[in-house]
Amino acid sequence: MPVAATNSESAMQQVLDNLGSLPNATGAAELDLIFLRGIMESPIVRSLAKAHERLEETKLEAVRDNNLELVQEILRDLAELAEQSSTAAELARILQEPHFQSLLETHDSVASKTYETPPPSPGLDPTFSNQPVPPDAVRMVGIRKTAGEHLGVTFRVEGGELVIARILHGGMVAQQGLLHVGDIIKEVNGQPVGSDPRALQELLRSASGSVILKILPSYQEPHLPRQVFVKCHFDYDPARDSLIPCKEAGLRFNAGDLLQIVNQDDANWWQACHVEGGSAGLIPSQLLEEKRKAFVKRDLELTPTSGTLCGSLSGKKKKRMMYLTTKNAEFDRHELLIYEEVARMPPFRRKTLVLIGAQGVGRRSLKNKLILWDPDRYGTTVPYTSRRPKDSEREGQGYSFVSRGEMEADIRAGRYLEHGEYEGNLYGTRIDSIRGVVASGKVCVLDVNPQAVKVLRTAEFVPYVVFIEAPDFETLRAMNRAALESGVSTKQLTEADLRRTVEESSRIQRGYGHYFDLSLVNSNLERTFRELQTAMEKLRTEPQWVPVSWVY
């Protein structure tokens, strides 16, 4: 009924219109409301609501559930007329057809709601499974394929038989639905298959035209897996993997790619496909890859020294920053990133923009340009220090001044994102300062050290992490020369400084690349700034993939 559909749409629209008032009325989190809005605005959900309305409109009920008895009465009446009328004789013949009788029987069963399957016989001989398989248990499955075309199936040996181990999602066999995991392959085109999985794979790969398989069905009920999406944190090439059961069935991917996991039944090999589309393939499971990574020695260049953020930071830097070193040790001890589960969210504004990069690569310049470009939308924190203010300094303009004792107490309480000491004075960024900028309705722009991202990467701060990558050595030297000539900078960097910047940039990328949402090579400040602006605008118009822990 059109009215019901209209009522359904109006009700959903009313809920959407009132989502804005829910945080004040219920205390609901902003991210949860964004997720709820995305679900309710989904075309699939709206279609389901309409379908529900249609199904609720009219409940169809059978007129009667004893049509077989009715037909028998009709046949008795027709028996007297059949000799006199050819039409009556033809009707009697139709009503006695086996197919028509089966149709009526099925109708009566559905009408009387007799859906239960009879229980198995309690007297079944337990030795039945050891008896020869009856001929009617064997199935013949026909497949048409071209030579070299993959079926999308792998095999294992079980009890001397070749059994289907997995069916690749999206492959030919999965699309046809004729074979199932656990089916035993007996023959291919009339030839016994033996017990060599590789030989069977080669036989099926080279076959063309009509391929007839004789199988013993497993009758296993397939289960519907939940949708799982992951972001990959390593490169994988199945052609170079000696452990994969079938190299041709593997799925190649690079760090940063988004995959949909379609099957996790195997402890070592998952089935996945790229979210952009394409066929599914095998990838190493989290467990298998963790075992392999455990034997790889960690790059010593990435190990923090003495609690500082980066052992290569120049001694000339004003502040040698540290951040929550007790938590840092905990993070590093358990950090072995393989796959990160993510969820797709509708467009929304991030609360923080975190700029990561080597010293002197231009992070602070980009931060200042962004805030000057749109001060109503972007803001930043004011650092705290324990030193005494100079005569020209005012509280909150450049620094917030507190006593050393107060600052040390707050550091011990974990209230600082990062902190350090320079010339006997403490400097640091309070976490509450970030909360204050976010509460004012602005995006908090931070140019922090890489390890601080580990603290910020939560549902509270939902950061957008941008890595400002140093260009190559020659480009960096030319940029410094141009800055000196134009008067933008008065500091001439030595070759050692420039090489240190390039090397530090590479180390940060290797050690923290899995946290980055975007990487920009800063070979031209104006161009990099425009690219950063474009990326921030896209967040307001395009769906985003975020860690699943931010959503659930």
Curated annotation (Swiss-Prot):
Gene3D superfamilies: 2.30.42.10, L27 domain, P-loop containing nucleotide triphosphate hydrolases, SH3 Domains. One of its GO terms (cellular component) is cytoskeleton. Residues 8-59, 60-118 form the L27 domain. GO terms for molecular function: PDZ domain binding; structural constituent of postsynaptic density; transmembrane transporter binding. Residues 140-219 form the PDZ domain. The modification Phosphothreonine is found at residue 117. It is found in: Cell projection, Dendrite; Postsynaptic density; Cytoplasm, Cytoskeleton; Membrane. The modification Phosphoserine is found at residues 42, 121. InterPro entries: GK/Ca_channel_bsu, Guanylate_kin-like_dom, Guanylate_kinase_CS, L27_C, L27_dom, L27_dom_sf, MAGUK, MPP2_SH3. Expressed in hippocampal neurons. Its main location: other. Residues 225-293 form the SH3 domain. Keywords: Cell projection, Cytoplasm, Cytoskeleton, Membrane, Phosphoprotein, SH3 domain, Synapse. It comes from the Eukaryota. GO terms for biological process: excitatory postsynaptic potential; long-term synaptic potentiation; protein homooligomerization. Residues 350-537 form the Guanylate kinase-like domain. Phosphorylated by SRC. The keyword Phosphoprotein applies. Postsynaptic MAGUK scaffold protein that links CADM1 cell adhesion molecules to core components of the postsynaptic density. In CA1 pyramidal neurons, required for synaptic KCNN2-containing channel function and long-term potentiation expression. Seems to negatively regulate SRC function in epithelial cells. Can homomultimerise. Interacts with CACNG2. Interacts (via the SH3-Guanylate kinase-like sub-module) with DLG4/PSD95 and DLGAP1/GKAP. Interacts (via the PDZ domain) with CADM1 (via C-terminus). Interacts with KCNN2/SK2 (via N-terminal domain). Interacts with SRC. Belongs to the MAGUK family. This is MAGUK p55 subfamily member 2. It comes from Rattus norvegicus.
